Amino acid sequence: KSKIKKVTSIELDSLVGNSDHQGLAMKIDKPEIFDFENLKRSINNLGKIILILDHIQDPHNLGAIIRTGVFFGVKSFVIPKKRSASITSGAIKSSAGAIFHSNVYEVSNISNVLKLLKINNYWTLGTEIDGNDINSKKLDGFKNLNLAIILGSEQKGVSKLLKKKCDSSISIYGNKKIDSLNVSVATGIILSKFANP
């Protein structure tokens, strides 16, 4: 049974560390973050689709991607240890609890993850501005395969190194007035094409 304690709005701001709490806060255990060794041991239980987040910077985007992924049945997410958003209170809040239904693997080297996945029959798709249209029949063959989908950072996209390791590139084409979408929005559109929740 949880204990409920009433506090002033100033006390709540202080407890949470900001005023973005809608008048309510809950103390919870931080979700467990796994490493590359855990990923290797779990290789047969990662799921049909794994999302690899290539230096996503905004914790709120990270949380929103996890929320979207879990909605579409994704349970495994890979993030780099350095130069990337981590699992903060903001990321947890943005995930709307979805993070507690997922496994996040924090790794030193994404290339090593891709090598491991390739050996274990995963195909890699990387997001790009000028890749293959996700509605293209050319990509239909990927829909029944195990997939590692790489989502690039908000500013730089997928790194050149990781692009070279992809089996194919994928893009979402709009009306050209705007050249890209928020990464969490793009995640939802991509997963609606490739995931079977």
Sequence positions of predicted segments:
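Post-transcriptional modification and biogenesis factors for structured RNAs
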Residues: 1-197
